[in-house]
Amino acid sequence: MESFSSKSLALQAEKKLLSKMAGRSVAHLFIDETSSEVLDELYRVSKEYTHSRSKAQRVIKDLIKVAVKVAVLHRSGCFSPGELALATRFRQKLRQGAMTALSFGEVDFTFEAAVLAGLLIECREILLELVEHHLTPKSHDRIRHVFDHYSDPDLLTALYGPDFTQHLDKICDGLRKLLDEGKL
């Protein structure tokens, strides 16, 4: 007997459509204003660090695609109880990373690239495990691309250095607001 699920087909179509439209207009459906400001600042950091507009756009586009797809999966109730526990663990680890990034930004001479990179790598692994059975290998590669980019110790060291102070301050302001509002 043929196994057919209209829900599965609709979800597949939704993910396919969203993957083709990962621009700002679609992102605003899933990403609030503060998150959007943080993403814009992360784009600026990536662009200045890599000296490449296209590389910076690619990493942010990948980040948005992954965030939207995970949001669609979550809102559609696609995660099993075990996967929901992984999602909770991911959120806690991401929150820990945000608080660590804030602490490093607020207290002089406390920054350690290895600590922040380690937290981001843990987030990557948890997220990959969470979406293992739901997203394509191409989406898994996007996750690796985003987390590998932002967990690069050289990029993190530059971000916490004097040349990126303005960007770091804006990122920290956004992270603080997201934490205060319980969105992170």
From Swiss-Prot:
Entry comment on modification after translation: Phosphorylated by TAK1/MAP3K7; this phosphorylation triggers association with BTRC and subsequent ubiquitination and degradation. Ubiquitinated in a BTRC-depdent manner; leading to degradation mediated through the proteasome pathway.
InterPro entries for the chain: TNFAIP8-like (IPR008477), TNFAIP8_sf (IPR038355)
Residues modified as Phosphoserine: S3
GO biological process: innate immune response; negative regulation of inflammatory response; negative regulation of T cell activation; regulation of apoptotic process; T cell activation
Classification via Gene3D superfamilies: Tumor necrosis factor alpha-induced protein 8-like
Pfam families in UniProt: DUF758
Cellular localization per UniProt: Cytoplasm; Nucleus; Lysosome
Keywords for the protein's UniProt record, in alphabetical order: Cytoplasm, Immunity, Innate immunity, Lysosome, Nucleus, Phosphoprotein, Ubl conjugation
GO cellular component terms, A-Z: cytoplasm; lysosome; nucleus
Superkingdom field: Eukaryota
Primary location recorded for the protein, binned into one broad class: cytoplasm
Coiled-coil region: none
Purpose of the protein: Acts as a negative regulator of innate and adaptive immunity by maintaining immune homeostasis. Plays a regulatory role in the Toll-like signaling pathway by determining the strength of LPS-induced signaling and gene expression. Inhibits TCR-mediated T-cell activation and negatively regulate T-cell function to prevent hyperresponsiveness. Also inhibits autolysosome formation via negatively modulating MTOR activation by interacting with RAC1 and promoting the disassociation of the RAC1-MTOR complex.
Family recorded in the similarity comment: Belongs to the TNFAIP8 family. TNFAIP8L2 subfamily.
Subunit text: May interact with CASP8; however, such result is unclear since could not reproduce the interaction with CASP8. Interacts with RAC1.
UniProt note: domains: The central region was initially thought to constitute a DED (death effector) domain. However, 3D-structure data reveal a previously uncharacterized fold that is different from the predicted fold of a DED (death effector) domain. It consists of a large, hydrophobic central cavity that is poised for cofactor binding.
Protein name per UniProt: Tumor necrosis factor alpha-induced protein 8-like protein 2
Recorded name of the encoding gene: Tnfaip8l2
